[in-house]
């Protein structure tokens, strides 16, 4: 009861946190908090004044995008790590909830698609550069010690990376319409296939065929290295053009999933059957980009869903989608060999423990 207004009950209660959504975030992304007494009020004369709580991830102060009594959006600040989130209001501290937060593992990159991982657990990422401009280093290798070292040079505008069944790294160049084949030590680079327009996303099927997305409307199929037709290019399917790049990933059933980001907020993931027939697998995303799958067949795609950006998880049958990781500027991801994931923004790779096993890519 208020001492100034004895007939008015006191509204000061400790905030109570029930759950957080989504499952994880990177700095710049926001967690949605569900609970009670998140927004307290004080009796100040005849007025009831809302009092914003203070939020912290561990010892790192955080700020709100929105606060209501039972729901709030709190933004993950730079420097935050996986820790307990608490709210404090009028001297009362909430119960803690663990917040899973990704931490930077490499920066000063120019990422336009998924990173790639080799059989030894090394991670590879591009420094793509502005169109038509070469960068001093084209691809970096990030070892288990999290040290980034130059891996390949002199590839113009690297746009996608994928490991082939021959253990070589393949890289597309959107400026040249070419896919390059790079030896495991990065000391030998050769042209594998060329003449593919604005070559962007790449992926291998189980037979070792390479699929390349020309963002102007064509998916090419390229004969595998070591076959009777290595590097030979065929038209596999056609799609609506993309303003940026195609991103490709294979399902266990042999269907090729493709995103083709544009300016629409209601975009699709396409599924292309082995015979080239194309259908819409899921619709309702904003600017979908890099995608990956887990061993259960769930699809993870860098996209916006209902106005929030991050990694969206879609069920294997395409019937349901949810924001799984919150983060602005995300362009792709890949699963590592220890249940963790590498998340790519335009300039930084983040490491995040998810406890998820990714689908083998070849």
Task: Show the residue positions of the predicted features.
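Immunoglobulin-like IPT/TIG beta-sandwich domains and homologous Ig-like subdomains
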Residues: 2-93
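Edge beta-strands of extracellular beta-sandwich domains
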Residues: 92-102
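Short loop/turn segments that connect beta-strands within beta-propeller blades
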Residues: 100, 142-147, 182-187, 222-228, ...
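A short beta-strand motif characteristic of beta-propeller blades
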Residues: 100-107, 146-152, 187-193, 231-239, ...
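Beta-rich, blade/repeat-based domains predominating
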Residues: 108-121, 126-131, 135-137, 154-168, ...
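A short loop-to-beta-strand structural motif that recurs across blades of beta-propeller domains
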Residues: 136-140, 177-181, 218-221, 268-270, ...
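Structural signature of WD-repeat beta-propellers
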Residues: 143, 173-174, 214-215, 273, ...
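Flexible, glycine-rich linker and terminal segments associated
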Residues: 322, 340, 346-362
